[in-house]
Amino acid sequence: MVKRGSKVRILRKESYWYQEVGTVATVDTSGIRYPVVVRFEKVSYSGVNTNNFSLDEVIEVNEK
């Protein structure tokens, strides 16, 4: 189960961060469509370093 502080790899192909690893900032349990907020080291073209994903668009990884 993905929880706050977990390292996750992004599986959404159209995402700027596709196949990148980020840290989960929060997981919303209220039933919204994209409940997982992920924070990245790298910023996108518009200067953003966070994005929302659904639970099936992220996979937890064990990076040291």
From Swiss-Prot:
Principal location: plastid
Any Pfam family hit: PSI_PsaE
Location of this chain's protein in the cell: Plastid, Chloroplast thylakoid membrane
PANTHER family registered for this protein in UniProt: PHOTOSYSTEM I REACTION CENTER SUBUNIT IV A, CHLOROPLASTIC-RELATED, PHOTOSYSTEM I SUBUNIT IV
Record organism: Guillardia theta
Assigned GO CC terms: chloroplast thylakoid membrane; photosystem I reaction center
Protein name, per record: Photosystem I reaction center subunit IV
InterPro entries associated with the record: Elect_transpt_acc-like_dom_sf, PSI_PsaE
SUPFAM superfamilies: Electron transport accessory proteins
Gene: psaE
Origin: domain of life: Eukaryota
Family the entry assigns: Belongs to the PsaE family.
GO process annotations (BP): photosynthesis
Keywords: Chloroplast, Membrane, Photosynthesis, Photosystem I, Plastid, Thylakoid
Gene3D superfamilies: 2.30.30.50
Function: Stabilizes the interaction between PsaC and the PSI core, assists the docking of the ferredoxin to PSI and interacts with ferredoxin-NADP oxidoreductase.
Topology versus the membrane: Peripheral membrane protein
